[in-house]
């Protein structure tokens, strides 16, 4: 009885016939879980690998609830609590195995203090005896570290962090791009419109995920020496937020080391000509308040001397957590002339927090000059919010298109962004996205606009004959020019306007080059 008390103290055990869930709609990756459970994978376990609020626990519940009554009797859901260790968990599992349990769903496995050291017990002992084991945990990086070490070649990973727009739309039954952005690209119960919600997610799901995983690693210094240094000086979140605030497609140490200037604040000031907000906003106060809200430190306030090693290590872990995407970029695809790779933050909530922080601070009267009226305040706040959503819409469309066509044919399709200065006339031209079918020698040019209005200026680059000739010569003959925006689909002077939500939903089912018609 003493041993039983020990393991029940640190884990919660729920038998399969006690599991029920009201969630009917399923993640697209659910069939991968079903496939693992219904087929033989000798000596292997399955891991639901992803950030918080991406449906891992719900998927476990859904699978268990659909089992027959007979199979439910052979199934158990175990929730690991803090201070649980592998000895306690193994004792509980052996007892259950002796009673006929063969399906083990182990949630919050990264709470097990020595999981990264003894996690191969699941594969080498229980799975080898014919048990089916599915694990999941909040600190998903800990699972990745185990996969690269003690569970190498013994684990099937099901990735849950990335929730494309179409899947999000299906799960919550809403086609709004705004909802997707405001909910942070996760399956949370409430939108990330409050700074507290977005900050809590960043602290726990991202920063905490990295640090807790490294703390439980036998070789934390080998895996994350630079990250650990930033954490010890309480500067990791600051560096992460300064990377995000650049709102650019390439982050450097020099850029992160610059004094913080809120991108939504300064970009909105410079993009609104009338009225001139230079004389209406207490800019320095608003910037400082936003900086404080995001926990950002400037170079002279940091104890750590930020280096390329720090930045590269942080980027690497963000890649492992599926929060970061690197997209190859070319100045000329035909000649092979490269430009810097694009770097995109995949989790909208991380970026939308910057808009949330600014807007919250702009609610304070002290941020405005006495000459600024309520209407002007509201206009500025709306435009600042639209600025961030515009950046996010570009990121979402570019990332989802890239991932889709990489999956269809890695070698045939090229998807990236293009921004160049034409050498013959010194014109600066750009496309928010270019899609090239290398097999056919065809190019598609896209502008992405967070707007429901058709404005002629939106297509100035798409109508630039010098730019089109450059694309023909360096990427492939321009087949079609498109604007992706939030309005209704239509056609204006050979330029197609497609609704962004409609386009993103088509991406989920496309199996070849998308045909605008």
Model-derived segments and their meaning:
Residues 1-37:
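N-terminal pre-Walker A segment at the start of P-loop NTPase domains
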Residues 397, 401, 431-457:
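Conserved catalytic cores of phosphodiester-cleaving nucleases, focusing on short active-site segments
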Residues 56-57:
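Conserved lysine of the Walker
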Residues 146-284:
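Interdomain motor-coupling "hinge/lid" segment immediately C-terminal to the ATP-binding subdomain
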Residues 482-517:
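Domain-level recognition of nuclease-like catalytic cores that cleave nucleotide substrates
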Residues 218-431:
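Accessory nucleic acid-recognition modules appended to NTPase machines
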Residues 125-147:
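Sensor-1/coupling segment of RecA-like P-loop NTPase cores
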Residues 97-119:
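Conserved P-loop NTPase "ATPase switch" module shared by AAA+ and STAND
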């Amino acid at each position: 009885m003493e041993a039983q008390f020990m393991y029940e103290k640190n884990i919660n055990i729920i038998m399969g016939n006690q599991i029920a869930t009201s969630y009917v709609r399923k993640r697209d990756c659910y069939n991968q879980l079903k496939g693992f459970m219904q087929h033989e994978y000798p000596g292997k376990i399955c891991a639901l690998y992803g950030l918080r609020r991406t449906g891992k626990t719900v998927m476990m519940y859904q699978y268990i609830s659909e089992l027959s009554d007979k199979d439910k009797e052979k199934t158990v859901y175990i929730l690991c609590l803090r201070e649980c260790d592998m000895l306690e968990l193994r004792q509980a599992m052996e007892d259950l195995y002796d009673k006929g349990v063969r399906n083990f769903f182990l949630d919050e496995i990264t709470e097990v203090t020595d999981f990264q050291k003894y996690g191969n017990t699941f594969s080498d002992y229980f799975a080898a005896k014919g048990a089916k084991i599915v694990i999941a945990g909040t600190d998903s990086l800990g699972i990745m570290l185990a996969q690269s070490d003690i569970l190498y070649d013994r684990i099937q990973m099901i990735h849950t962090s990335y929730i494309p727009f179409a899947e999000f739309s299906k799960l919550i039954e809403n086609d709004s791009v705004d909802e997707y952005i405001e909910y942070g690209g996760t399956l949370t119960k409430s939108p990330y419109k409050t700074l507290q919600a977005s900050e809590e997610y960043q602290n726990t799901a991202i920063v905490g995920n990295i640090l807790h995983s490294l703390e439980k690693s036998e070789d934390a210094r080998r895996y994350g020496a630079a990250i650990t240094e930033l954490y010890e000086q309480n500067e990791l979140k600051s560096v992460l937020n300064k990377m995000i605030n650049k709102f650019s497609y390439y982050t450097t140490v020099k850029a992160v080391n610059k004094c913080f200037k809120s991108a939504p604040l300064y970009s909105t000031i410079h993009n609104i000509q009338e009225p001139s907000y230079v004389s209406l906003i207490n800019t320095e106060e608003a910037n400082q308040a936003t900086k404080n809200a995001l926990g950002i430190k400037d170079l002279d306030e940091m104890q750590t001397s930020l280096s390329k090693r720090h930045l590269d290590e942080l980027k690497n872990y963000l890649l492992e957590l599926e929060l970061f995407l690197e997209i190859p970029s070319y100045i000329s695809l035909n000649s092979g002339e490269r430009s810097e790779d694009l770097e995109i933050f995949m989790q909208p909530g991380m970026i939308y927090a910057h808009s949330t922080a600014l807007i919250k601070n702009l609610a304070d009267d002290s941020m405005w000059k006495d000459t600024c009226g309520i209407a002007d305040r509201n206009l500025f706040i709306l435009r600042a919010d639209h600025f961030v959503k515009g950046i996010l819409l570009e990121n979402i469309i570019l990332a989802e298109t890239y991932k889709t066509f990489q999956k269809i044919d890695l070698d045939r399709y090229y998807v990236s962004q293009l921004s160049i200065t034409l050498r013959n006339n010194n014109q600066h031209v750009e496309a928010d996205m270019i899609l090239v079918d290398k097999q056919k020698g065809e190019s598609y040019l896209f502008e992405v606009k967070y707007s429901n209005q058709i404005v002629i200026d939106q297509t100035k680059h798409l109508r630039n004959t010098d730019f089109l000739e450059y694309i023909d010569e360096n990427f492939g003959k321009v087949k079609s020019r498109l604007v992706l925006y939030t309005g209704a689909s239509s056609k204006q002077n050979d330029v197609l306007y497609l609704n962004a939500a409609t386009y993103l939903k088509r991406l989920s089912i496309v199996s070849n080059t998308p045909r605008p018609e």
